[in-house]
From Swiss-Prot:
It comes from the Archaea. The keyword Isomerase does not apply. PANTHER family: 60S RIBOSOMAL PROTEIN L17. The keyword Disulfide bond does not apply. This is Large ribosomal subunit protein uL22. It holds the Pfam family Ribosomal_L22. CDD domains: Ribosomal_L22 (cd00336). Belongs to the universal ribosomal protein uL22 family. The lineage of its organism: Archaea, Methanobacteriati, Methanobacteriota, Methanomada group, Methanobacteria. Gene3D superfamilies: Ribosomal protein L22/L17. This protein binds specifically to 23S rRNA. It makes multiple contacts with different domains of the 23S rRNA in the assembled 50S subunit and ribosome. The globular domain of the protein is located near the polypeptide exit tunnel on the outside of the subunit, while an extended beta-hairpin is found that lines the wall of the exit tunnel in the center of the 70S ribosome.
Amino acid sequence: MANKYAYNKETNEAKTARAMAKSLKISPKHCVEICNAIRGMEVTKAKNYLEDVIDMKKSVPFKRHNRQVGHRKGQEGWAAGRYPVKAAEQVLKVLENAEANAEYKGMDTENLFIEHISSHRGVVLPGVIPRAFGRMTPFNTPTTHIQIVLQEAN
């Protein structure tokens, strides 16, 4: 069965490259905020941005899931932000995979931008933690799916 993308726009397949990752053990909320931050960026700028987030030099603005999130110094346009390192590493891997797919198709990798990026909640991996007096508390692990479509700029 073919992978379905949330991106339905008719495109020239010779000028687009795609990549997808499923069931990653990262926070869906962090991933949504990272995707919103890098959507529409050039690939080189997005990679530099994600590397800065991993090194905790730049923060990701949390615009939707920002309750109890502190302000960050040096953030432009939005005060609340965090450094979601684990999610940024996974998004960077998928972005590099999409760039490699573009290179394989013979596209100019210096001229790529992120046409579409989205993240969705995946399956929840059930788990339990033993508690006192023989009880158990659910401790579930959320997973995330990521989709990226790169396009060559004209």
